């Protein structure tokens, strides 16, 4: 065998991050549809006995029909036992209880940024896709227990869903900071930093759902399965069995099967897209 061919679905609508960049903030009806599809995606992964571990807007792709599909299973693991952090030997002394019982001066400084300032900074940063590609991993959606030394399970994916819902409705992730290191500090001491700004004007049910997911692992909504989330008042009268038949808020306008207008355009000198890997347009 000299060649290996991978046959995959082509999802021409781009990724969900691109949609968020375009829309900035989604209304409650739009957010309800997309978070419902995310819940179904994670439910399917968990039913296979897996943990996705890398749920973020960039890994949610939009199909020709406008529906979401989950991608990038490079960090996924089977959930037979509790998993330990990415580097437990290095992180063993970094548990939330042991090392961050008091906020450092730098951490206290992080709490002072207001809603409008965070929103503006995040909008500028996420529009810089080259910056995004050059960053090895994004910590914004990682659950706090991943940084600890007690292990974790499928509940980490539900934290990520809550963070993405917050971003959809507020305009930035709840623990966004100027640097990945500062973001990690915020997540580790999340109870000190987590706040839903009144300026965002979220409904009671939306606020309740976010707080139920961005919560301690042992109390997190979804810990006992996706049905917990489906029964939340935020989804009152939502027809879970008909999701695939619902019209998505955004449907890509595709001219033909080769239309890639919803994908990032790479420059000729882009180091992340070598010339030899490009497909000729002719």
Where does each model-flagged region fall?
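AlphaC helix of the protein kinase catalytic domain
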Residues: 17-26
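C-terminal regulatory tails of eukaryotic serine/threonine kinases
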Residues: 84-124, 222-282
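Activation segment signature within eukaryotic-like protein kinase domains
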Residues: 34-35
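Protein kinase catalytic-loop region centered on the HRD/HxD motif
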Residues: 40-50
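Conserved short submotifs of the Hanks-type protein kinase catalytic core
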Residues: 2-15
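Conserved end of the kinase activation segment
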Residues: 127-131, 145-155
């Amino acid at each position: 065998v000299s060649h290996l061919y991978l046959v995959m679905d082509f999802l021409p609508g781009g990724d969900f991050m691109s949609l968020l960049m375009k829309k900035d903030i989604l209304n409650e009806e739009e957010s309800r549809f997309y978070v419902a599809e995310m819940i179904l995606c994670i439910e399917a992964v968990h039913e296979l006995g897996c943990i996705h571990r890398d749920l973020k807007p960039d890994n949610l792709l939009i199909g020709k029909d406008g529906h979401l599909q989950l991608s990038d299973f490079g960090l996924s693991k089977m959930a037979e036992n509790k998993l330990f952090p990415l580097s437990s030997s290095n992180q063993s002394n970094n548990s939330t209880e042991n090392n961050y019982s008091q906020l450092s001066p730098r951490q206290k400084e992080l709490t002072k940024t207001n809603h409008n300032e965070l929103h503006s900074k995040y909008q500028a940063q996420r529009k810089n896709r080259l910056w995004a590609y050059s960053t090895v991993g994004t910590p914004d959606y990682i659950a706090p227990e991943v940084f600890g030394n007690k292990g974790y399970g499928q509940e980490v994916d539900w934290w990520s869903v809550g963070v993405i819902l917050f971003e959809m409705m507020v305009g930035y992730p709840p623990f966004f900071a100027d640097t990945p290191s500062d973001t990690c500090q915020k997540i580790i001491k999340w109870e000190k930093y987590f706040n839903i700004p009144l300026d965002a004007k979220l409904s009671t049910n939306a606020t309740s759902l976010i707080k139920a997911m961005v919560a301690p692992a042992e109390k997190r909504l979804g810990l006992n399965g996706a049905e917990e989330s489906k029964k939340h008042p935020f989804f009152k009268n939502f027809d879970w069995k008909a999701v695939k038949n619902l019209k998505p808020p955004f449907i890509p306008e595709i001219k033909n099967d080769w239309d890639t207008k919803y994908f990032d355009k790479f420059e000729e000198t882009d180091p992340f897209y070598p010339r030899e890997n490009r497909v000729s347009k002719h």
